[in-house]
From Swiss-Prot:
Keywords: Ion transport, Membrane, Metal-binding, Transmembrane, Transmembrane helix, Transport, Zinc, Zinc transport. Residues 252-279, 301-329, 337-346 have a biased composition (Basic and acidic residues). This is Probable zinc transporter protein DDB_G0282067. Belongs to the cation diffusion facilitator (CDF) transporter (TC 2.A.4) family. SLC30A subfamily.
Length: 573
């Protein structure tokens, strides 16, 4: 036993996963390669995206041209009346034109294929565009703020409020149009680079299984030797059962039931009782997905994960489940069930995932922006939203100057300029920060590295791990790499499959797992005792280039301080 926590409760087995991921089950049960299907999904998505850039190009060109014409008019008016507010708004709109050009280029560049010079392609062009847009806004805000402060010391009288109103009104209309266009364009074409996820709500689950031999019933049913002569009652539940009848063959059944009361099953079958057993019952919407391996040779140990409101009834090898069995009236519930019933001679365990009554599963943060746009489009959207608000303030400023008189009106222009600057900076700073964190390859906020390390350590055959890195290529596309120490003699492919499941459940679909087959330490009787032991470094020649050089430094120091008989020399391994 080389793993310190090597016992039944701490070792991850293939069947320790809830298998509530429909995509993974579908590909796994049908002998498909999951990663290849993810690639095919991304390829299809890429082809769909290639058909869409026309609308974005039209939006960029039309709004950009209109904005450029307006900037020329606004800057001319600002110089004519000597207004800092109009000047700042004009420069703001000019930065919009520049940002539109950058964003348009980023959209085009992001669709280029990878080559020998850009192995990832130009995917990060959108991030670069969003960062540039944010920096333009922040620099413009700083410039206007520096210009506005002297105006409070030496205020200048303002006239021609009517010109303010005409110019600001035109700008407000253009910016509102741009905001709507890019909000709609960005949301309708938004995409996530995660590998095709699904969202399942209560009562609306689905099941991927073999399409052959599907049967539809409108009454009771039995599984794998259940008594067919039992009384069949109407049900009000939608069930999708995918039962593996042999090690390879798959038999799928679909049942539609009305006013479901109970299921009765014989030995080694699955009995379920949904609904109250004592008094009145309200409607329940259930969606079930059952996958049961019925071949005698199958040995599956799925852990229990029950989140039921009510109780369970179990007897010998026949498992009866009562979901939501309260003593009085029942509330409406929507349940999504995923059952993977592997039949063993004396033990059966079920994995349940319930959406509805008290869903306790942790929800992950969405990786996109609040409107579902990529960061590049979100930057353009922020530009026009900020412009629309600033144009509104300019319009108010013009109205105040035109309809009121007094010494205090001289402070309106610089005051409004500072308000606009604060609003623009408040919306731009988070965009710059987010783009910067992606370029700095920060770990995404919804990823817990300690949790991943813990799960990796539980995998049977893994004795050490180090250099775990998780980062984002673009917003929504997370990548990971890790070095794992494996006992000599272990099959790497099976261990890698378990590790990929761990990353997959964390929303990481692009992983690089580097195995390190560790030697047996004759002095300890097990694998090397250093959990950070790394044998992939060439200690002598490329000390500054190691990806895990800290580990090798510890090995060097241990070798230096050890007796000759205990030296661990990487080059001798």
């Amino acid at each position: 036993m080389y793993n310190k926590n090597n016992n039944n409760n701490n070792i991850i087995d293939d069947n320790d996963y809830d298998d509530d991921d429909d995509d993974y089950n579908y590909y796994n049960n049908n002998n498909y390669d999951y990663n290849e299907n993810l690639i095919s999904k991304d390829t299809k998505k890429q082809k769909d995206l290639e058909k869409e850039p026309l609308s974005k190009s039209i939006a960029f060109i039309s709004i950009g041209t209109l904005t450029l014409l307006y900037v020329i008019v606004e800057l001319g008016a600002a110089l004519y009346v000597g207004s800092l507010t109009l000047l700042s708004d004009g420069f703001h709109n000019l930065s919009d034109v520049v940002s539109l050009v950058i964003a348009w280029w980023a959209q085009k560049a992001a669709k280029r294929d990878s080559d020998n010079f850009m192995s990832y392609g130009w995917a990060r062009a959108e991030i670069l565009g969003g960062l540039t847009n944010g920096c333009f806004l922040l620099s413009m805000s700083l410039y206007v703020a520096l210009e506005a402060i002297p105006r409070f010391i030496r205020p200048e009288p303002m006239e021609s409020g009517l010109i303010f109103m005409i110019v600001a009104g035109s700008g407000l209309a253009i910016n509102i149009l741009g905001t709507i266009v890019f909000a709609c364009t960005g949301m309708s074409h938004a995409h996530s680079h995660g590998g095709g996820g699904h969202s399942h709500g209560g009562g609306g689950g689905h099941s991927h299984g073999a399409e052959k031999e599907k049967k539809k019933e409108k009454h009771g049913h039995s599984h794998d030797g259940a008594d067919k002569e039992k009384k069949k009652e109407k049900h009000g539940h939608g069930h999708s059962h995918s039962t593996a009848t042999t090690a390879v063959g798959i038999n799928s059944e679909e049942h539609n039931h009305d006013d479901h009361d109970h299921h009765d099953h014989s030995e080694e079958s699955h009995g379920h009782s949904h609904g109250g057993e004592k008094k009145k019952e309200k409607k329940h919407g259930h969606s079930h997905s059952h996958g049961g391996g019925a071949a005698e040779g199958i040995n599956i140990n799925d852990e229990h994960d029950h989140d039921h409101e009510g109780h369970h009834d179990h007897s010998e090898e026949n498992h009866g489940h009562s979901h939501g069995g309260s003593e009085k009236k029942k509330e409406k519930h929507g349940h999504g069930h995923s059952h993977d019933g592997g039949v063993e001679k004396k033990k059966e365990k079920h994995g349940h995932s319930h959406d509805g009554v008290e869903k306790k599963k942790k929800k992950k943060k969405s990786s996109g922006t609040c409107l579902g746009m990529d960061l590049n489009m979100f930057g353009v959207f922020l530009h026009f939203l900020g412009d629309a608000i600033s144009s509104l303030f300019v319009l108010i400023t013009g109205a105040v100057i035109h309809f009121t008189h007094g010494k205090w009106t001289e402070y309106i222009d610089p005051a409004v300029s500072l308000i606009i600057v604060i609003m623009i900076a408040a919306t731009s700073a988070p965009l710059v920060k987010r783009c910067s964190m992606i370029l700095l390859q920060k770990v995404p906020d919804d990823i817990d590295l300690d949790s991943i390390r813990y799960k990796i350590a539980k995998v049977e055959g893994v004795v050490s791990q180090h250099d775990l890195h998780v980062w984002q290529l673009v917003d929504g596309m997370t990548i990971a790499s890790v070095h794992v120490g494996i006992e000599q003699g272990r099959e790497f492919q099976s261990i890698a499959s378990k590790l990929r499941k761990i990353f997959h459940k964390e929303g990481i679909h692009s992983t690089s797992i580097q195995p390190e087959f560790l030697p047996i330490n004759s002095f300890t009787g097990g694998a090397t005792s250093d959990p950070n032991f790394c044998i992939q470094n060439c200690v002598d020649d490329c000390e500054e280039e190691w990806c895990c050089k800290k580990s090798a430094d510890r090995i060097r120091m241990r070798n230096f301080n050890s007796k000759n008989s205990n030296i661990v020399d990487i080059n001798d391994i």
